[in-house]
Amino acid sequence: MKKKIKEVIVVEGKDDISAVKNAVDAEVFQVNGHAVRKNKSIEILKLAYENKGLIILTDPDYAGEEIRKYLCKHFPNAKNAYISRVSGTKDGDIGVENASPEDIITALEKARFSLDNSVNIFNLDLMMDYNLIGKDNSADLRSLLGAELGIGYSNGKQFMAKLNRYGISLEEFKKAYEKINMK
């Protein structure tokens, strides 16, 4: 029996809908990629946002991140779910549609709200202390840690911003960091 998700899951395309519905029992809404800026998706999503809540699940690429930013401007209290680049890539194609049902379920379980708090725990010094910036393997570490925390991959500065924006505690960060270093 598939896990039931109460929020509406927002994806980019029709193949993403199929992949998500294969993984969970949920209402899924397609924004048609960058066409979200031109069509009536925002108006339609407002009702779902107010009544059920939204989970934004876009592709783990630049275009997906741009679409996520656009949606988050309109729906600041939506949850964000991330598929890793590794689990979202098949034969050179990157997208939610390539992720396994298990990876989609994991991403949805790790979905996070963006917090509007003024306390930033993570700074450049901490990022350097944990080799998340400035080292040859920093990008790989951020990719693994982003997948473990459910916040996706980003460059160093954006990764630090996500850690703060999603309210990740230092304890949660350290546990995830230890876990990826045991693999």
Curated annotation (Swiss-Prot):
<feature type="binding site">
    <location>
        <position position="61"/>
    </location>
    <ligand>
        <name>Mg(2+) 2</name>
    </ligand>
</feature>
<comment type="function">
    <text>Required for correct processing of both the 5' and 3' ends of 5S rRNA precursor. Cleaves both sides of a double-stranded region yielding mature 5S rRNA in one step.</text>
</comment>
<dbReference type="InterPro" id="IPR006171">
    <property type="entry name" value="TOPRIM_dom"/>
</dbReference>
<feature type="binding site">
    <location>
        <position position="12"/>
    </location>
    <ligand>
        <name>Mg(2+) 1</name>
    </ligand>
</feature>
<keyword id="KW-0460">Magnesium</keyword>
<dbReference type="GO" id="GO:0005737">
    <property type="term" value="C:cytoplasm"/>
</dbReference>
<dbReference type="GO" id="GO:0046872">
    <property type="term" value="F:metal ion binding"/>
</dbReference>
<dbReference type="InterPro" id="IPR034141">
    <property type="entry name" value="TOPRIM_RNase_M5-like"/>
</dbReference>
<dbReference type="GO" id="GO:0006364">
    <property type="term" value="P:rRNA processing"/>
</dbReference>
<dbReference type="InterPro" id="IPR004466">
    <property type="entry name" value="RNase_M5"/>
</dbReference>
<protein>
    <recommendedName>
        <fullName>Ribonuclease M5</fullName>
        <ecNumber>3.1.26.8</ecNumber>
    </recommendedName>
</protein>
<dbReference type="GO" id="GO:0019843">
    <property type="term" value="F:rRNA binding"/>
</dbReference>
<keyword id="KW-0255">Endonuclease</keyword>
<feature type="binding site">
    <location>
        <position position="59"/>
    </location>
    <ligand>
        <name>Mg(2+) 1</name>
    </ligand>
</feature>
<keyword id="KW-0699">rRNA-binding</keyword>
<dbReference type="Pfam" id="PF13331">
    <property type="entry name" value="DUF4093"/>
</dbReference>
<keyword id="KW-0540">Nuclease</keyword>
<comment type="similarity">
    <text>Belongs to the ribonuclease M5 family.</text>
</comment>
<keyword id="KW-0690">Ribosome biogenesis</keyword>
<keyword id="KW-0698">rRNA processing</keyword>
<dbReference type="GO" id="GO:0043822">
    <property type="term" value="F:ribonuclease M5 activity"/>
</dbReference>
<keyword id="KW-0963">Cytoplasm</keyword>
<keyword id="KW-0479">Metal-binding</keyword>
<dbReference type="Pfam" id="PF01751">
    <property type="entry name" value="Toprim"/>
</dbReference>
<feature type="binding site">
    <location>
        <position position="59"/>
    </location>
    <ligand>
        <name>Mg(2+) 2</name>
    </ligand>
</feature>
<dbReference type="InterPro" id="IPR025156">
    <property type="entry name" value="RNase_M5_C"/>
</dbReference>
<keyword id="KW-0378">Hydrolase</keyword>
<keyword id="KW-0694">RNA-binding</keyword>
<feature type="domain" description="Toprim">
    <location>
        <begin position="6"/>
        <end position="90"/>
    </location>
</feature>
